[in-house]
């Protein structure tokens, strides 16, 4: 029985390792130099597995953020894949469901072909117009796998 359980575990490990195809590192920095980092997560479950870090700033502050996405799938290029990033108001810190993508504070997207181990990313700045709780999220799109990846940071603007 124990040997069968170990064999099953070993059989599942390679497929779990192959499922990961992108690594994402997201960093957000407030004007006072405080920064938070988030790394690749995936859905399901809704909201991912990892708790989101929280960056505190004030209305009118410019938040600098950068993300780097790496194709860690060693056997294949990502063709016609995409990445989307946005800042949107949400109701509470740690909110699991992504809020409706209406009245975005900032957004951007691009399409790319990415060879194995290649990286793509951007640096942006966004001025936070009003106090509130916001979601900064970067997500992969059209990666032709069974799931997409994202990284996210909550912004608490006072």
Give, region by region, the residue ranges found by the protein language model.
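Residue-level recognition of secondary-structure-to-loop junctions
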Residues: 128-129
């Amino acid at each position: 029985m124990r040997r069968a359980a170990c064999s099953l575990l070993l059989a599942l490990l390679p497929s779990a390792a192959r499922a990961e195809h992108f690594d994402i590192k997201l960093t957000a920095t407030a004007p006072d130099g405080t920064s938070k980092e988030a790394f690749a997560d995936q859905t399901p479950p809704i909201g991912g597995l990892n708790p989101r870090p929280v960056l505190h700033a004030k209305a009118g502050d410019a938040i600098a953020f950068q993300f780097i996405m790496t194709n860690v799938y060693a056997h294949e290029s990502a063709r016609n894949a995409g990445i989307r990033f946005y800042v949107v108001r949400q109701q509470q810190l740690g909110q699991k469901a992504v809020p409706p993508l209406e009245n975005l504070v900032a957004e951007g997207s691009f399409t790319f072909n990415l060879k194995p181990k290649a990286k793509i990313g951007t640096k942006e700045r966004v001025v936070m117009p009003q106090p509130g709780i916001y979601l900064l999220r970067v997500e992969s799109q059209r990666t032709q796998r069974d799931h997409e990846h994202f990284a996210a940071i909550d912004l608490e603007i006072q």
